[in-house]
Amino acid sequence: GGTNYIGDVGRTNFVLPNSLVGGALLKWNRSPRHAFRFSLLYAEINADDADSNDPRRASRGYSFSNTIAEASLGIEFNFWSFDLHEGHPQSTPYLYTGITYFRADHLLLSADFPNGELENQGANWDFAIPVVFGYKESITRHIVGALEVGVRYTFTDNLDGSWPEEIFGNRMPRREFGNRNTNDWYVFTGVNFTFSWGR
């Protein structure tokens, strides 16, 4: 699949994948209407003010890249009954939510920042709330394919290096930028395939 970021650098499009994401997921189908789900995903996020339609960002000229490694656990709710035991093709829209724990790099605007250069300040471990909308369909009795779009609302505003207070615990106005009242988001868009066993 693909991923994009929504925050204080670059474009603000909700779904506009610009880098790859990969991973694995495990589901436990508890009923035809819900399943427990665990996933591991790895992706790179990046953004560039030069791509923004906002003239203020375009003239500022900042850019960044970061890596996301996440584990997510939660519940997937089927809008319609989805039971592979039925013996005929199954399909349904679904919603997934739960809790995500992820690792990214802590970034900091360089002290000498005429070009908006960023310094890596180590690992940033934090939580996010995943909200995933998808549509799945049985391909065979044991294989299910799905298309989904999933947003992660994070509890950090520093995926892009805009909020150094999260690193040092105090304000650093000369190294801050963007909107301090909103946290960063990242979005995964793609397809997945699950294989059932024990039936």
Task: Describe each region flagged by the PLM.
Residues 24-28, 73-77, 97-101, 131-137, ...:
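Residues on the lipid-exposed face of transmembrane beta-strands in outer-membrane beta-barrel proteins
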Residues 138-199:
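Predominantly the C-terminal beta-signal and adjacent terminal strand-loop region
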